[in-house]
Amino acid sequence: MKLGTNCALLVVDIQQEDFQTMTVDNLGDPAWDCIRSARRVLDVFRARRLPVIHIQEAHRADHVDFGRELDGAEGLHCLEDSPGTDFAWLTYPLPGEYRVVKRRYSAFFGTDLEILLRGLHVDTLVLVGGLTDVCIHYTAADAHQ
């Protein structure tokens, strides 16, 4: 994998709630492939000592900070202090890796992610995560702006 020196990895929403009950039966082979691929990319960034930023979705227990998620079929999820909100074991942050908590689909909305990326002089992002049609999509779109 060819990566520049100003590249960072965003590991988006790979959390216990989404993956703690993961089996081939309930996720299927494509999901396992996705998770294994995310780990391979993470291993490359770690080996090259490039910045890794873990994005964690977390909502207040009284639900005041939920957005459009509750308009659809998602329901309550990723509540602060819930074991399911913790990072998944497969991609758990190591010491020295960054963490950003978000409350919306995009990792940029209402967070300090842009400040962190500027401080690290990042000009290229690689994104991995489990929900590519929502959180990866919105984070990538906001990164492009």
Residue spans for each PLM region:
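Short Gly/Thr/Asp-enriched flexible loops that form oxyanion-binding sites at enzyme active sites
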Residues: I136-Q145
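Internal catalytic-core helix/loop-beta-alpha segment
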Residues: S82, A88-G130
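Acidic, glycine-rich active-site loops and adjacent beta-strand->loop/helix elements
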Residues: A58-H59, Y105, L131-V134
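Short, glycine-rich nucleotide/cofactor-binding loops
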Residues: N26-A31, V126-D133
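Active-site acidic carboxylates
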Residues: M1-P93, Y98
